[in-house]
Design a protein with these regions (language model features):
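N-terminal segment of the mature folded domain
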Residues: 74-116
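Sec/Tat signal peptide C-region and signal peptidase I cleavage site
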Residues: 17-23
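Pocket-lining segment of extracytoplasmic ligand-binding domains
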Residues: 85-87, 95-97, 103, 125, ...
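An extracytoplasmic/periplasmic, membrane-proximal ligand-sensing/linker region
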Residues: 190, 195, 200-211, 218, ...
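Bacterial N-terminal signal peptides
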Residues: 7-16
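Extracytoplasmic small-molecule ligand-binding "clamshell" domains
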Residues: 41-74, 246-250
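Positively charged n-region of N-terminal signal peptides that target proteins for export
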Residues: 1-4
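Bilobed "Venus flytrap"/periplasmic-binding protein-like clamshell domains
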Residues: 27-53, 57-58, 116-186, 190, ...
Length: 323
């Protein structure tokens, strides 16, 4: 993929001292999510802090995905990447979407950016629960996100706890549409899809647009605890006021956090500098990416399936965040 110059990103405040004379320049390739998405903007802001503090650093930011980023780190194609905690757990265990454990990965920081699973049906579908789909063998027409996406995987994990598979849905006469979220939203608007699924932070613009045209219902996840234990998701809740009150009531679901992972063979000094830039430049980062405001140094070092990089651990311990 084409590497994008960080000089195009918003200029941020200089932090830290210049790199000492004689030290090796920092050279990094960073993989985020889609261009202009939350992780792309947030990781871009962190990379800009590094280039500001170390003018001779060579840092490139490229788009990526939850599934491809761990493999790129294992293959030494990238040095640091954004990753959801639940997919990191799959990488550690070697479970779907991976065929075996993914190596050469350590954690840098848990950003604790909340991404909740939206399971949304048209109100006129008559569907009120996931249990009802199983009991009545409803021929569900569902858009669970692109094939292999974290949205589809999380949705499948939830369905499996209810004793439902995608093959079951097809056997009952339903259809699985792995179109992009915009297409599926349009299909739901036209009555071609009963359910739209999305895992992400806040209110997705396409769901906001859909809710303005079609009455919707968010289905609760009652099997959240079982899913959490297996896949390192957590039990979350949508406030009733979301989507201009269309949510109607607080609705239980599952969610995941965003984290930063790095190569295991990254030098301790580089991992230390990345952690320092993130922690000491926090205000600059969240100015560029408000969704990362959940990040705090006090909690950044735990809650991740991969062990912490020794360089990051050194910073957290030096500053007293980690005892």
């Amino acid at each position: 993929m084409k590497k994008l110059s960080l000089t195009l990103l918003l200029g941020l405040a200089l932090i830290g001292a210049p790199q000492q004379a004689g030290a090796e320049p920092i050279r990094l390739t960073a993989a985020a999510g889609p261009v202009a998405g939350t992780s792309y903007v947030g990781l871009g802001a962190l990379c800009k802090l590094i280039t500001n503090a170390h003018p001779d650093a060579n840092v490139n930011l490229i788009p990526g995905s939850d599934v491809s980023n761990p493999m790129r780190i294992q293959n030494r194609e990238v040095d640091i990447a954004c990753e959801t905690v639940c997919i990191s757990k799959s990488a550690v265990d070697g479970t779907e979407p991976f065929r075996k454990p993914v190596g050469n990965i350590l954690s840098l920081a848990n950003l604790r950016t909340e991404a909740l699973l939206n399971i949304v049906v048209r109100a006129d579908s008559g569907i009120t629960s996931i249990e009802q789909i199983r009991e009545r063998k409803i021929p569900l027409r569902v858009g669970p996100g692109p094939r292999g996406s974290v949205t589809q995987l999380a949705f499948e994990w939830v369905l499996n706890e209810y004793g439902i598979t995608f093959d079951d849905i097809k056997d009952w006469g339903g259809k699985i549409y792995n179109n992009n979220f915009n297409d599926v939203s349009d299909m739901a608007k036209d009555g071609q899809v009963d359910m739209v699924v999305w895992l992400g932070p806040g209110e997705a613009w396409f769901l906001t647009e859909l809710s303005a045209n079609v009455p919707l219902r968010w289905l609760p996840v009652s099997e959240a605890a079982a899913v959490n234990r297996k896949h390192m998701l957590y039990t979350g809740e949508f406030p009733a006021a979301m989507f201009k009150g269309m949510m109607g009531r607080n609705t239980r679901t599952v969610g995941t956090w965003m984290s930063l992972i790095v190569r295991e063979d990254m030098s301790n000094d580089t991992a230390y500098e990345l952690t320092r830039a993130l922690c000491e430049g926090r205000e600059d980062v969240i100015t560029a990416c408000p969704q990362w405001a959940t990040f705090t140094p006090e909690t950044a070092w735990n809650g991740m399936p991969h062990p912490l990089h020794p360089g990051a651990e050194r910073y957290y311990r030096e500053k007293g965040y980690m005892k």
